[in-house]
Structures are given as structure tokens and as C-alpha cells.
Amino acid sequence: MRPRIRDVSDKLRPNRASFDDGETKFHRKHLPPLRTMFGRWRKWTVLVAAIWIQASTGTNFDFSAYSSHLKSVLGISQVRLNYLAVASDLGKAFGWSSGIALGYFPLSVVLFAAAAMGFVGYGVQWLVITNIITLPYSLVFLCCLLAGLSICWFNTACFILCIRHFPNNRALALSLTVSFNGISAALYSLAFNAINPSSSNLYLLLNSLVPLVVSFAALYPVLTKPSLDTTPDYDSRRHDSHVFTILNVLAVITSFHLLLSSSSTSSARLNFIGAVVLLVFPLCAPLLVYARDYFLPVINARLNHESSGYVMLNIDELKNQKTSVSSKTGYEHMGTAKEGNTVRLGDEHSFRLLISRLEFWLYYIAYFCGGTIGLVYSNNLGQIAQSLGQNSTTLVTIYSSFSFFGRLLSAAPDFMHKRFRLTRTGWFAIALLPTPIAFFLLAVSSSQQTALQTATALIGLSSGFIFAAAVSITSDLFGPNSVGVNHNILITNIPIGSLLYGYIAASIYEANASPDITPIVSDSIVCIGRDCYFKTFVFWGCLSILGVVSSLSLYIRTKPVYHRLEQDKVSLTSSYKDLDPL
């Protein structure tokens, strides 16, 4: 008789005999020991700390809120102002330095190095904009570059925290924390209205101080060592699932609160306090789950009784277990990197192989003509609002909030996979559709406040989805182990697009500024009227159509790849069940 192969996942499976003993007896479930509860709670404080860091460090999104004031103080043209926005985006080109630093220094050192760079980068700009000191344009450019680099270092610290402490749920942890980066501008706008809504230089002071303060607040969770138990039991997995659900609900509530608060100025301080409470409240989420399990035992027991008895396993963990078992039983490891001598999509790609792929360039163009245009639009919101006589703070908040919604929606392929058989690249193509619609709406009726706000919301929604979904698509198509390098190659389109699109927009802006009707403040030209950005909106709209076409081509070419990956997962799961029958 062939012996049963046992592995660490046995403890994840409920005993089927417990469902066949006749009438189920429901009883109040005992709370776990305080030491266990505290250990689990500490793990969630790490995720909450990452959320705080992300929510406070998306400082590049509020550039448009103070850019007009900075332009006036420096006495520069619109083109040179655009170069400052490019400098902030150019920091992404040096983001690899944070990975090297992690090889030599603890994570806490990397975190505070990022805080120090942001403190200096934004702090010096605040000293310049308040006329405390005077600096040449080149040094201000370097400060913008340093501030942009600090954001990359903060992001790296958050990614490492999620990967170390949530190895079985890292995709959920990463998507949740990255989403909060999208609400930074709305959060800073609310703080701006609560403190002093008449001084736009306050944004730079907040950008300098808040991430530093948050880094000190997050120090204790950052120093927490990850759990050694990489295969938690059934109760732990169910507990984690419920906590993630609560955190996602709180994320949506927080975003709605920030969005609705942007239109209210009379109770700005109360709204800001409410936002802070919503950011702190996730610390209570694990305790709510414990209370639910304790006070609603009958409901929980019935749900467990009526369930199928199967437990969802992490696919990466499943692959590792399958590999170890296969080495003992003669089963071949599935999902090999090569088929003959040809590397397929979905396998690991080197740099040379990556840039030789047509699919990569379709992906690059789709991102370049989609998400990057949305980012450049957000950088120009200050001048767009000024030229149309609108409030830039409101537009920044709308863009930030809907960018956050887009980032949350990027998880749709995982939750709706069984209902809608659409690949990630298909969702990516759909997410690009609102962008050309929004720009042509702006070209036709940008002078109307409703049209301007609607278009801004559509662009924020589209670009937010693209920013968050791109990491998963890169991993799917070009290999998960190479995603760090390959994704950094992909996002080189951001500084290129920021420079190109921003320069074109600035040139059109200055060409339509008539000295006879346009005031000149500190040698900087200010354009007023619909014509300032009309041609820019048309140009961006046409380019975004190219992005949609490119994304559709990518979707068509990658459908077989996702079908093969899905079959591999099904085969892997079936093989695992054959090796370990119940």
C-alpha cells in the first residue's frame, strides 16, 4: 500500500469527519491567548505603518497646488517650471539605489534616509518660496530631484515590509498600501485648508515635515521581526482574510471622506481630524475580528459547516510544496522556464530579451500614452486651473481621490476572475478608455466647471488603475523574479513622457499668452483663457487613442499566455491533490 505523503499543509485542512458526526454543536469560541493575539496584532501594525507611509509620501501629486507660486517667486517660464516637474519624476530613474542600500543597511536606516532626503528637498524649496533664502535655478532643480528620489526610497521600504511580514498575502498587502499613495494630495489639501488656506507654500512645509514625523511614528512596527511561521493554520488564514476585508472597506470610506470634504471649507479642521482618525482606526481591525469570532460563534460555525471544507492555498506556497514533493516521487516540476530553446512570455526575461519583445514595446507605448499622460496632466493642474479661473486645490483633491479608486479597482481581475474571463491586459485596455474621452471633453468644454471636474476624475481613475496594475502585468508577462528590474525599465517612460509632454504643453501655453491682456508677474508669463491648453488637450487625446490601440493589441497577443498560465495553475493544483489525497 502506497503511504500517504504528508506535508505542512495538512494542518490547513479541516477534518471532514467533523462535518459527518450528525448534528453540529455550536458553542462559543475561546479567544486565543493574549500572547498570540498580541503577536498577530503586531503584524498588522506593520501593514498600518506602511499605509501611513504611503499616504504621507505621495508628495509629487500636489506639485500643481504650489507650482504657480513657485514659478512666480523664481521668475521662470512655463517651460523651466516643467523641468522642475520632470526633475521630481526623474528621481524614479535612480530608484534602484534604494535596493543597493538595503543590501548594506537595515530597513529602518533606509526609511529615515528617505525621510531626510524629503526633509531637505522640500524644506529648501519652502525656504526659497517664502523668500527666506535665494538659490539659483540649478540648485532648486537638484532639490526637486532629491525630493523625487525620497519617494522611491519610501516605496521600497513599504514593499519590503509587506513582502517580509505577509509572504502568503503579499499581493493583497501591496495593492492596499500602494492604493493609499494615491490619496496623499487629497490629504495634504485637507490639511492645507485646515491650517492656512491662503498660503500655498504651506504644501512644501507639510511635504517636508509630515513624512519625517510619520517615519518616527512607524519606527516601532518597522523594527518588528517577521513571524517565522510561513504556513499559518486555518484560523489564522481566515482571520487575515477578514482583516483585509475590513481594511479595504476603511480605505473606500477614507477616500469618500476626503473627496466630500474637499468641497467644505467651514469645517476643514473637523474634516482633517476625521481623516486622521480613519487612518489610525485600522489598528483596531484585528481586534474587531476577534470580537466577531467571540460574540458571533453560531454564525461562524454555521458558515464553516455549510462551506465546502476546502482552504485556499497561496499559489507560490503551492509551487514550493509541489517541487519538494516531486523530487521524492518522480513527478516533473511544472512551469519550466523554457520550451526547447525558446523563452516564452510568462518566463523570466533578461534585459536583452525583454527589449526584443514586441509585447514589451506595445506595453511600453500603452503606458507611455496612458498613465504617463495622466501624471503630466496632474503636474499641470495648477496652471490649468489658473488659466480657467478654477480652484486648483479642488481639482488636485478630485484627481487624488479618483486615482485612489483606480488603484483599488486594479484588484478587480483577482476578485472577478470567475465571473468575467478577462485577462489583466484586457482590464488594462479598458482602464485606458476614459483617458481620451476626458481629454476631448476638456477640449470641447473645459471652461465649464462640471466638465473640468468630470474629466479630472476620469483621468485620475484611469491613471490610478494603470499605476497599480502595471506591476502585476509585468510579473505575469516577463517573470515574477525579474519584476524589480523589468518594471524599472518600463517606468523609464515616465520621465521621458514628463519631459516631452510637459515641454509641448508649456510651449503652447506661452504661445497663447498675449502680453496685451496677460499680466506678467516677476517676469513669468501667465496665460488666461480656454486657448491656453486647447491644443494640448487635443494632442493628449489623440496620443491616448494610440495608447488604447496599443493596449488592445497587447491584449490580443497575450490572451494565449494567460490561458497557458491558468492551465498551469489548474494542473499544479490537480497534481498537488493527487499527491496528497484526503
Curated annotation (Swiss-Prot):
SUPFAM superfamilies in the record: MFS general substrate transporter
Record's bilayer topology term: Multi-pass membrane protein
Keyword Transport: yes
Main location: membrane
Spans traversing the lipid bilayer: 46-66, 100-120, 132-152, 172-192, 202-222, 243-263, 270-290, 358-378, 395-412, 425-445, 458-478, 489-509, 536-556
Compartments reported by the entry: Membrane
Glycosylation positions in this chain: 391
Keywords: Developmental protein, Glycoprotein, Karyogamy, Membrane, Transmembrane, Transmembrane helix, Transport
InterPro entries, per the entry: MFS_trans_sf (IPR036259), NFD4_C (IPR056555), Nodulin-like (IPR010658)
Record's function text: Required for karyogamy during female gametophyte development, when the two polar nuclei fuse to form the diploid central cell nucleus.
Protein name stated in the entry: Protein NUCLEAR FUSION DEFECTIVE 4
Species per Swiss-Prot/TrEMBL record: Arabidopsis thaliana (Mouse-ear cress)
